[in-house]
Amino acid sequence: MARLNVNPTRMELTRLKKRLTTATRGHKLLKDKQDELMRRFIDLVKYNNELRKDVEEMIKNSLKDFVMARALMSSEILEEAIMYPKEKISLDVNIKNIMSVNVPEMKFKRLLEDDNGSIYPYGYSNTSAELDDAIEKLYSILPKLLELAEVEKSTQLMADEIEKTRRRVNALEYMTIPQLEETIKYIQMKLEENERGALTRLMKVKTMLEKEQESV
């Protein structure tokens, strides 16, 4: 590992030791964050897969009923029955924080247009029970479908944050900290060499002075 290009002084040694302490502490905090993010991410992925499976199954069942309804009803009557929306939906998207990751939190409100609370956008005279079943199932899918969108977006954002954190952890672990350790070791070695050199010079001066005194 290449060391940093710095002057081998005691002041620089003190500064680098402080940087190493900060980097080591930061590495531990980021590693802990990475581990916790991974734990939550795995739980979220499992829940996402289960939720997606449920939603796909519900949609498949609803489509089966639509196919049956289409077989029993004319295309014109079917299209006319589902042409006009029965309810209005308003969606509020807020943000919640999970381990420094801002993920969406979705809430929606449903408002049926007529007073009797019926979810069916048609009368019952010319339509089939299969169409009723399809509409009812689609109506019940919406909350889960919205939750699925929320969970999948949260999963994506957490995956991005895990990757960012992993890069920072690796940069500290494999580059910054080893460079600091190598540079500190180099400065300590240079300072020890300087001390030994200074001590040798002092010993030589002392010897010379002693010889001068003996010759007097």
From Swiss-Prot:
Signal peptide: none annotated. It comes from the Bacteria. Gene3D superfamilies: 1.10.287.3240. InterPro entries: V_ATPase_D. GO terms for molecular function: ATP binding; proton-transporting ATP synthase activity, rotational mechanism; proton-transporting ATPase activity, rotational mechanism. Keywords: ATP synthesis, Hydrogen ion transport, Ion transport, Transport. GO terms for biological process: proton motive force-driven plasma membrane ATP synthesis. NCBIfam families: PRK00373.1-2, V_ATPase_subD. PANTHER family: V-TYPE ATP SYNTHASE SUBUNIT D (PTHR11671). Belongs to the V-ATPase D subunit family. Produces ATP from ADP in the presence of a proton gradient across the membrane. This is V-type ATP synthase subunit D. It comes from Clostridium novyi (strain NT). The lineage of its organism: Bacteria, Bacillati, Bacillota, Clostridia, Eubacteriales.
